[in-house]
């Protein structure tokens, strides 16, 4: 992606194969990666932010859990909120200076402050839109619950930043977006969502992503319908936990984007109606282990090329993800039924 504005001489043109960013992040991204600072200062800034952001998020999460009585005492609130630090992918994000951890913290914070300030929640979600593959789906619960102010603030901030980026780089706003989409479709180190395994069978990336979006949308709609029917639609932790699970399957991802799964981890810890049966948990764990081990075992012991085996391993991972969703909703359905009775 090139504009008519010359590159910075000390940096030069960047290799497109190293990745890119959405156009509005040229402006909004400076909150996380301040490009106007000297490189050495920026490294210190983002490293500090990688520690401060989850700490602030954990504190706000603890307050949120106590306020809504998800936990009964401060001790349990501390234990639950510390799960923000739990995802091992934090190490990946910090090591490579990736902003995913901070983006995920912004999403979680938007939930924590929503009832106090829709404007602040909208701004936090707008910053998180620097990685729309993580944050975009979180507009869905806001839409379902008619939080128009938060949606307007998020949309307006993103669109305004996009337009400003186009003006500053003297580029077409549309071409800026299509360029990064084309680049993303050829970025082979990414995990392309729920149907990623189809890539190994020769299916094009565009078809895979369309299937991801379609199935992710169906899951969100089904979850929303179920929550409204069971009168669980005021449970914001449940809304965000379900949406977080969908966020890792509906579009392309990299390992550090999975930090958002801290949300369902907290929900499982706190909500009595989201607990997996023991045998179901063991089954899911076994499928995950098998999916991880199959490529290595077949490559080392059987001499099969990893490219041949990986699609089947990804298929097993997909089964594990869907099994997780199934058991979560079955457990929630059972608990909701007991409450109604």
Per-range role (PLM):
Residues 1-120, 142-262, 340-341:
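Primarily membrane-embedded glycan-assembly and transfer machineries that use lipid-linked glycans
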Residues 106, 218-219, 260-267, 317-330:
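Hydrophobic cores of alpha-helical transmembrane segments in multi-pass inner/ER membrane proteins
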Residues 125-141, 251-257:
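Transmembrane helices and adjacent periplasmic/lumenal helix-loop junctions
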Residues 142, 267-269:
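Interfacial segments of multi-pass membrane proteins
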């Amino acid at each position: 992606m090139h504009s008519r504005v010359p590159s910075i001489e000390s940096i030069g043109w960047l290799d497109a194969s190293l990745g890119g960013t959405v156009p509005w992040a040229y402006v909004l991204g400076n909150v996380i990666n301040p490009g106007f600072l000297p490189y050495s200062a920026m490294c210190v800034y983002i490293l500090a932010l990688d520690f401060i952001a989850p700490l602030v998020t954990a504190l706000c999460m603890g307050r949120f859990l106590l306020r809504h009585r998800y936990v009964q005492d401060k001790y349990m609130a501390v234990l639950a909120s510390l799960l923000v630090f739990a995802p091992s992918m934090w190490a990946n994000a910090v090591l490579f200076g990736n902003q995913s951890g901070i983006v995920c913290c912004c999403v979680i914070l938007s939930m924590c402050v929503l009832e106090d300030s829709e404007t602040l929640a909208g701004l936090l979600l707008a910053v998180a839109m620097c990685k729309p593959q993580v944050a975009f789906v979180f507009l869905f619960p806001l839409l379902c619950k008619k939080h128009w102010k938060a949606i307007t603030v998020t949309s307006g901030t993103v669109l305004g930043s996009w337009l400003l980026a186009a003006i500053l780089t003297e580029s077409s706003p549309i071409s800026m977006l299509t360029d990064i989409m084309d680049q993303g479709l050829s970025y082979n180190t990414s995990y392309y969502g729920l149907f990623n395994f189809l890539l190994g069978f020769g299916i094009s990336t565009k078809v895979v992503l369309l299937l991801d979006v379609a199935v992710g949308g169906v899951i969100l709609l089904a979850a929303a319908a179920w929550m409204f029917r069971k009168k669980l639609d005021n449970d914001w932790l449940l809304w965000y936990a379900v949406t977080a699970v969908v966020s890792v399957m509906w579009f392309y991802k990299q390992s550090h984007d999975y930090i958002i799964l801290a949300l369902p981890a907290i929900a499982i810890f706190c909500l009595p109606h989201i607990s997996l049966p023991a045998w179901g948990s063991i089954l899911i764990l076994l499928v995950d282990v098998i999916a991880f081990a199959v490529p290595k075992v077949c490559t080392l012991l059987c001499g099969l090329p990893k490219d041949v085996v990986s699609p089947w391993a990804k298929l097993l991972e997909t089964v594990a993800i869907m099994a997780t969703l199934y058991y979560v909703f079955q457990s929630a359905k059972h608990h909701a039924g007991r409450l109604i009775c």
